[in-house]
Amino acid sequence: MRMFPMLSPSSRVLRTLATAGAALALAGCASTPPSANAPSGAVLQTAATHAYHGRFAVQYNDRLGRPQNVYGNFDWQEHGDDVSLELLSPLGQTLAIVKSTPQAASLELPNRQPQYATDVGELMQNTLGFSLPLAGLRYWLLPTPAPATPAQTVRDPADATHIKQIRQDGWTIDYLAYADAPATGVKRVNLVRVTPPLDIKLVLDQ
């Protein structure tokens, strides 16, 4: 999932993320209609509330094609269609707050006025240098494919109740670990997009 020199918004954020602390330690297809893989119950209701906390690492290429790495902690709060994502340094300092609603999106950086746009992806790309797929993550973290577009899923042969991989909207989402009982949910997930290249690693705290 460097900020201080006065170069550009994305450069400043990158420097803060990249120098905030030690690197994050982050130690296998059948086509199906999107709704066919959704868990039963209320998880897809638009009124659902979800909260996730954990660590992120992002690899991407900047505008000059140079590879970049950013990492830190994250706090995700979701209420219906509204999402708030806070990115923090490993020491807990707020680096950026992204808010997305069906009507608009905003992004706040420390000591700067909030920025607004109708497209949260474009706002993050222009400001941070990379864009997290918030619309897809709302479902992929459950985990289930997003309902609006076709998806391919692979079930874990060792546990058919667990999804091992989702391919959707140009992304490959690999579920590396689930929480140990009695806890439930995803524990580690990697997301990869080939074009443009973007690699996201998430570890969710229980």
Model-derived features: where do they sit?
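Post-signal-peptide N-terminal segment of Sec-exported extracytoplasmic proteins
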Residues: Q45-S84
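Gly/Pro-enriched, hydrophobic low-complexity segments
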Residues: A146-Q206
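C-terminal motif of bacterial Sec signal peptides marking the signal peptidase cleavage site
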Residues: L24-G28
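Bacterial N-terminal signal peptides that target proteins for export
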Residues: M3-A18
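An acidic-aromatic
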Residues: D82-S131
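Bacterial signal peptide processing site
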Residues: A30-P33
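Flexible, processing/modification-adjacent segments and terminal tails
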Residues: N111-D169
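Amphipathic hydrophobic-ligand
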Residues: Q68-G72, L95-K99, P196-I200
